[in-house]
């Protein structure tokens, strides 16, 4: 169960109060110096983002058909020692990943478990295998880092991603159905269930 960096208030590097494309370009261009930092968001992706409803952070809520998207990201690490979370374990009970494939936490009614995506400018594949209470109701993705220093370097970034594979909605519902005693997982469960019932979900 990932810990969302917004809740800590200790490492927000963002210059954004609300969605502002010009700020995004300055931030990503200044930090695009090695394989740790993402590339700038494409003009076309910024333009597309303007047409969609925004979440509480001012970020677009996309339909599943739009796979290239700009998202707000935060960072977390098992070294934060979130209460109740096993050492370096994700919401599936397996180890968090930080290699060619890397772990990410998200609101599972937006990004079901197993969703895979690429971050523009980085060579890694990210997989949604975690969640966090601060992510509920948002389009934010929380990127896992193995230590506090890299977590803080990432901070709060607006980046471009490409969804390469949607996760498994049935698996998502099965996992969350057994965790409805917790407020955040209960909200995720019913939101995901409503989306599946609507038929407006991608199944690759």
Residue ranges and their predicted role:
Residues 1-204:
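Solvent-exposed, well-ordered loop and adjacent helix/strand elements within mature globular domains
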């Amino acid at each position: 169960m990932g810990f969302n960096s917004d809740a800590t208030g200790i490492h927000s590097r963002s210059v954004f109060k609300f969605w502002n494309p010009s700020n995004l370009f300055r931030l990503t261009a200044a930090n695009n110096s090695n394989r740790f930092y993402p590339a700038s968001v494409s003009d076309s992706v910024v333009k597309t983002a303007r047409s969609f409803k925004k979440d509480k952070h001012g970020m677009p809520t996309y339909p599943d058909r739009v796979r290239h998207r700009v998202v707000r990201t935060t960072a977390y690490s098992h070294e934060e020692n979130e209460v109740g979370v096993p050492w370096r374990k994700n919401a599936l009970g397996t180890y968090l990943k930080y290699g060619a494939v890397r772990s990410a936490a998200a609101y599972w009614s937006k990004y079901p478990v197993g969703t895979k995506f690429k971050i523009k400018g980085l060579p890694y594949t990210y997989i949604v295998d975690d969640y966090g209470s601060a992510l509920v109701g948002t389009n934010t993705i929380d990127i896992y880092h193995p230590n506090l220093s890299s977590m803080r370097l990432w901070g709060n970034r607006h980046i471009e991603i490409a969804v390469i594979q949607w996760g498994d909605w049935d698996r998502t519902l099965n996992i969350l159905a057994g965790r409805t005693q917790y407020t955040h997982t209960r909200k995720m469960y019913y939101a995901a269930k409503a989306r599946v019932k609507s038929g407006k979900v991608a199944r690759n």
